[in-house]
Amino acid sequence: MADKADKMKARLPRGFVDRVPDDLRAAEKMMATIREVYDLYGFEPVETPLVEYTDALGKFLPDQDRPNEGVFSFQDDDEQWLSLRYDLTAPLARYVAENFETLPKPYRSYRNGWVFRNEKPGPGRFRQFMQFDADTVGAPNVSADAEMCMMMADTLERLGIQRGDYAIRVNNRKVLDGVLDAIGLEGEGNAAKRLNVLRAIDKLDKFGPEGVRLLLGKGRLDESGDFTKGAQLPEAAIEKVLAFTAAGGADGAQTIANLQAVVAGNAEGEEGVQELADMQALFFAGGYEGRVKIDPSVVRGLEYYTGPVFEAELLFDVTNEDGQKVVFGSVGGGGRYDGLVSRFRGEPVPATGFSIGVSRLMTALKNLGKLDVSDTVGPVVVLVMDKDTQNLGRYQKMVSDLRKAGIRAEMYVGGSGMKAQMKYADRRAAPCVVIQGSQEREAGEVQIKDLVEGKRLSAEIEDNVTWRESRPAQITVREDGLVDAVREILDAQARDRAEQSK
């Protein structure tokens, strides 16, 4: 026997989680619903590998020579850098570029899978998580962007989220670029300062307009005494940026009119406002007014996207870790990224897409009671009373007959006695067990114990002797009638569950 000191400690790496059967089944049911909507819209599934050449991930990497921050990377035997994918969009761009001549254009696809971030883990922040994306590559006009927003709205509603509990919020990178150009931050030379402005606007929900004003100016001192240096904009520029974030009106038409006033005279800004107006017209034509909203405060990802940008936000309250009521917030986002595929081809390739955070959306559905986490019915367990080869074959035939009839079943393969086997069946959430000892075998019979009904009756029969003598919820049937008898029990249990769920 190995010395205690030689035992390896079982430990899960930080930032990763194990997933249990109920979570896996609930996630699969949720993703099946998402697939139904995407299929309805005419999108096709595609799957890319978890590993890509590091240079294919492009702008996500801070250091191409030592790609060990932000992504998990390693070198193969010919010393080329490979990385676990950071998201699902960069691999799609590589796939489209590599198969460009054979794919239909526009190319409409969806995919779900694990992505990895080599970042410091924390509460709700993992190094491995699931995303579900849909993208259209090769469509230059905003009808493709509008379709993404409408598809996301339909997806949330198909999952059981009611209108009024969510909003798809839409902005446009070109409008903000017009504002930044107007305050003198045009060109690559101001890229760092532009990014600081974007980050300041992104804090609008957290700090409010006055907090953003400080971050756009000299900086902000928080309650703990920490100082965040600001973007150092002059007062007139700050007012211009804040006017942009406050341009939201009572409806889409008013918001668009406000934005037109903010960017008047700037060609790029005016182009962005017109794109929003075109999208708004499509939302109205499709019956999505009130579900999709033009909102200038949406800036998440604007440093990455090239045109329309959108975010799916859930509007109901939840209690956070500090016991405070807060709006649940974002469960997905996307936008137009016309530059990503072009990196591989040297020619313009327009693209737009949307990404859902699967784990976060599951949490939201759980809070709403809309996630299907109902207990899965376990397998019928055939108990093994006699372990000789001949009788094992008889038990095996029973379980095979049940499976052929489409009934989930297993034969106990452990080494314990009947009491332990019954405990095992209970832990497996078995609906019933099949028992055949020597007496039943000689009579050509089997006993079937309904564990669900047995639990219910046990609460009514308090005396142990009476319980044992009455053998509640246990029947004896001919061995050749096993399948029909088990099916009757399962059907009765299904009717009871349906009645209880009403």
From Swiss-Prot:
Catalyzed chemical reaction(s): tRNA(His) + L-histidine + ATP = L-histidyl-tRNA(His) + AMP + diphosphate + H(+)
Enzyme Commission code(s) on record: 6.1.1.21
Keyword Protein biosynthesis belongs to the record: yes
Alphabetized Pfam families for the sequence: HGTP_anticodon, tRNA-synt_His
Recorded superkingdom: Bacteria
Record localization: Cytoplasm
Broadest EC class assigned to this enzyme: ligase
Complexes and interactors: Homodimer.
Record protein name field: Histidine--tRNA ligase
